[in-house]
Amino acid sequence: MLIIDIGNTNIKFGICINNQIIQTLRISSQPRRTADEYFFFLNTIINQLNINNFTITHIIISSVVPSITKPMIELSTHYFNITPTIINNQHADICNIKIDLNDKLLGSDRLASIIGAVTLYPNKNLLVISMGTATVFNLISKERSIYGQVITPGAHIMAQSMRQHTALLPEISQIKVNKVVHNTLFYAIEAGVYWGYIAMVEGIVKQILHEENKDLHIVATGGNSILFIDHKNFIKNIDPDLTMKGMIYLHNMLFNK
């Protein structure tokens, strides 16, 4: 099976065999790419991986970028002769998940992550933190009701915003920084973004725990979740592939596997 997770910053492809993700590939989200370009990229990588007896029989897509969804559907139908499954809010009902929010429309990536979390950690009150372009804190009851949320900028937006709104500050990369105080401009900005993001997430989690006043099983996913590998004092599980795992679980429910 081919899993396609289309985000605002990156597109993540997952190659899945027997319900196991054996390889993930990531490229930047560029709305002008064509189905032909995506096929060339995928075909080249899959051939290089030399996976024995791998044939794409199913494709499932999560997308928050409609302009990229269209060429991905074309890729699926034209090159693989497959009608892909496109995740939408109706799939919450199939997975016995209730969206108990005033705004019922969830991003498909959020829904997939929540499907993954409630499947992996059943009968628990959950706080699922999706750390992508935006950082979304999802509160889910042990009865599978999504009842609360907090949404903040992601680390990438924080760094990008500083660069866009200043004339002289340099562009930085998103990496772990061991200490907060530096004597060079570049490392001072890197440290500010990294430690500022860590402090923001920790502070919001602390406030959520105070307001909820109950045990929450905390799970982090998304590209920025790896920044918290050394900060697991309050995050129980860090799983960058949680969204894709949720897509696998949904696929299995839809096709009774």
Curated annotation (Swiss-Prot):
Catalytic residues as annotated in Swiss-Prot or TrEMBL: D109
Lineage, uppermost ranks: Bacteria, Pseudomonadati, Pseudomonadota, Alphaproteobacteria, Rickettsiales
Main subcellular location of this protein, as a coarse class: cytoplasm
Co-factor requirement: NH4(+); K(+)
Binding site residues for substrate: G107, S108, D109, R110
GO biological process: coenzyme A biosynthetic process
GO cellular component: cytoplasm
Pathway: Cofactor biosynthesis; coenzyme A biosynthesis; CoA from (R)-pantothenate: step 1/5
Enzyme Commission numbers on file: 2.7.1.33
Species of provenance: Ehrlichia ruminantium (strain Welgevonden)
Protein location: Cytoplasm
Keywords recorded for this protein, A-Z: ATP-binding, Coenzyme A biosynthesis, Cytoplasm, Kinase, Nucleotide-binding, Potassium, Transferase
Gene: coaX
Enzyme class label: transferase
Cofactor binding description: A monovalent cation. Ammonium or potassium.
Region forming the signal peptide: none
Subunit structure: Homodimer.
Protein name per UniProt: Type III pantothenate kinase
PANTHER family: TYPE III PANTOTHENATE KINASE (PTHR34265:SF1)
GO MF, one example: ATP binding
Pfam families: Pan_kinase (PF03309)
Coiled coil as UniProt keyword: no
Physiological role: Catalyzes the phosphorylation of pantothenate (Pan), the first step in CoA biosynthesis.
Catalytic activity: (R)-pantothenate + ATP = (R)-4'-phosphopantothenate + ADP + H(+)
Family to which this protein belongs: Belongs to the type III pantothenate kinase family.
Annotated binding of ATP, by residue: D5, I6, G7, N8, T9, N10, I11, K12, T133
